[in-house]
Amino acid sequence: MAAREVEEAADMIRADRKEITRKQGAAAGRRIRAKIERTSHSPENDVTPSNPESNANAAHPPWMPVALAELGIRRHPPGSINPRIVEYNNQTNLVGYDDKISWCSSFVNWCMARADIRGTGSALARSWLEWGRPLERPVYGCIAVLTRDDPASWKGHVGFYLRHDEEQVYLFGGNQLEEVRELAYPLNEVIGYRWPVAG
């Protein structure tokens, strides 16, 4: 990836942080800034700021500030429930469920709903393989669907693509070590990248 593209990707993330600061205050902005500073940006493992929908807004997806603002939301220990994760589940067919179930797809659905984009409404990660349109190459903020265990099974994981290198893909998502955070996964577990259909 060219140095110019790396800088454009970093600019998108900084703009997301500014939007979060404006809407949710300085503390939220500082959380994101700290996360950005901990993330290394090198040409071979940064995001591709391409524009799948051929308009200026596609390179800066509106759901990413929503997702990044949730950094650190985590599953509560047994005996208590995180009400925010219950909110995520309420965007799916798991209405009313607590935070003790898999909630990666619930988080993605919740973020998309906050950006006024209809998600799958399903708590199954692989439901995103039928949503939107496929991408040949991942772009910042696209939805990445991963296999889990047996590639032929219904199990999976879903999150928002940040970047990749030769071996790993870095996603921002929910239920990643039981919280909303960035996490690396084996690149060979990716089974699809998706983007909303325009209109």
Positions of predicted regions on the chain:
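A broad, low-specificity signal marking well-ordered, structured residues that form hydrophobic/aromatic
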Residues: M64, V169, V190-I191
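N-terminal capping segments
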Residues: E37-A115
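Short amphipathic beta-strand/extended segments with alternating polar/hydrophobic composition
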Residues: R181-L187
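Cell-wall glycan-active module
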Residues: M1-M64
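Generic hydrophobic secondary-structure packing signal
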Residues: G25, W63, C104-F107, R137, ...
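Low-complexity, Gly/Ser/Thr/Pro-rich intrinsically disordered linker/tail segments
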Residues: N188-G199
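...with weaker cross-activation on analogous glycine-rich loops/strands in unrelated enzymes
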Residues: A59, A113, I117-R181
